[in-house]
Amino acid sequence: VNEHLTGAAPVDAPVVDESTIVLGVETSCDETAVACVRGGRDVLSSVVSSQVDLHARYGGVVPEIASRAHNELIIPVMARALLEAGLDGEDVDAVAATTGPGLIGALLVGVSAAKALALAWDVPFVAVNHLEAHLYAGFLEDPDLQFPMVVLLVSGG
């Protein structure tokens, strides 16, 4: 999804220290996922709503069905993630969302909801590249990983 479609112009990400709380949104394909993370590594909540059953009879993900399901699920999943983390909007320092690559309709649901919260809460919106996020997720498990490194990154079906 490019900057023209999402309004997610490249910006400097907010400085993350051990107390920074980010609400992260992921809707690039067929799962609606929201997590609250403190300090870049401490996962306070992670809520995932799968659409596997919706797409099973088609033998793969149907983009329009995925987008409509995200539209129905995004607010309840966000609310549950905040509730499970014991947070509300005034506790959140930034809102991040996957901006691509992915299914355009699915991405727009997540980006729109995330940007709306960032605007309402007057906090930065951080655009996240889906593939880069897969790479950096390894640091959650092993924060001492060092560059340079060789990575095989496979995503999707």
Q: Which ranges hold each PLM region?
A:
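Short acidic/glycine-rich loops and adjacent helix/strand connectors
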Residues: 1-157
